[in-house]
From Swiss-Prot:
A molecular-function term among this protein's GO annotations: structural constituent of ribosome
SUPFAM superfamilies according to UniProt: Translational machinery components
GO BP annotations, alphabetical order: translation
Record-stated family: Belongs to the universal ribosomal protein uL18 family.
Entry function: This is one of the proteins that bind and probably mediate the attachment of the 5S RNA into the large ribosomal subunit, where it forms part of the central protuberance.
Gene designation: rplR
Protein's recorded name: Large ribosomal subunit protein uL18
PANTHER family reported in the protein's UniProt record: 39S RIBOSOMAL PROTEIN L18, MITOCHONDRIAL (PTHR12899), LARGE RIBOSOMAL SUBUNIT PROTEIN UL18M (PTHR12899:SF3)
Matches recorded under NCBIfam families: L18_bact (TIGR00060)
Amino acid sequence: MITKADKNATRKKRHARVRAKLTGTAERPRLNVFRSNQHIYAQVIDDVKGVTLVSASTLDKDLALNGTGNIEAATKVGELVAKRAVEKGVKEVVFDRGGYLYHGRVKALAEAAREAGLQF
């Protein structure tokens, strides 16, 4: 019998393949995105030290959001993570889409981060 592949397991495999090629350094850390049904999370990570430099999510109290699982919320998270990263002196990052397609909420977060000052 043919079984349907688990989407999250497929995403994790795709993410592992991409992560084998992507690393964040102190000069150019990695902007990681995690998306759930209700929320979206973004972290700027220095993989050499294994340290999260800045993070933002739809759970932050700084963001007054009506809905948290939509493109508008992802845009605000992108702006916030970029603002916090620029304040810490990070201007360039490597974008890690977390195995998700570059579409919808992931794309909105990335474009908002670019407009707010991050380069990738």
